[in-house]
Amino acid sequence: MVRPQAVIFDLGGTLVDSPWRQEEMDRRWMCSYRALTGHYPDAGWPDGEAYVRAMGEAEAAHWQRVGQEQWSGSPAGLLSEGFRRLGCEVKEQELSTALDGYAQAIAGWATPFSDARKTLCELRRAGYRLGLLSNTWWAAEWHNADLATHRLDELLDVVVYTSDLPHSKPHASVFLEVTTRLNVEPESCVMVGDMMIDDISGALGVGMRAVWKRNTRWIRPTHIVPTATITHLGELPRLLSQWRES
């Protein structure tokens, strides 16, 4: 096999630990609602419970479509769908305010795994190009703010969010987009992720090696076989070194 030259990481569940509890998701939408009604109190908005429910349904529909079609969408598109479900006509400034409220709610949303920064530093010293590929509807600047807070941004050569692309993982085009930006061939890349279908099958499909980071949250499909499996990111440098020397 070709010696690895670049490593591409998933974000949530791989580099960072992120809360996805229902109460946390509802809290974010309520923050969005409060920002909206605080700035535009006389616009005749529905009550907060209805807003949270409609936006949550729009978010669930987004992810369902991602799973079925490998589609992608933007933050503005998702909130617009939520307002449609509410039967509300929304102006551009109102939409922007609702988005800003959500963005404030997710500031500091995730915590890097304890070995994330150390592993990235080791891989950079070893000469690997490093990339990030995340399935998300969130705006790039929302994610980038958190990466900067934890000083992970300075260790990544390329960062790609599917909210900026027409497709989501496991669609081949998003993996090839990252390899193009890294200026390496897919066969020279290693994808590291915690989701078997999105990360592992997608990477294998374009000729990459694929390292599955164990995650008991998701059901593991038995028909997908990763190139290697790890429990902690700290296992990566040794694994990659073995591949380089083989």
Residue ranges and their predicted role:
Residues 1-7, 18, 43-46, 117, ...:
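Asp-based, Mg2+/Mn2+-dependent phosphohydrolase catalytic module
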Residues 2-126, 140:
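N-terminal helical cap/lid subdomain that shapes the substrate entry/recognition surface
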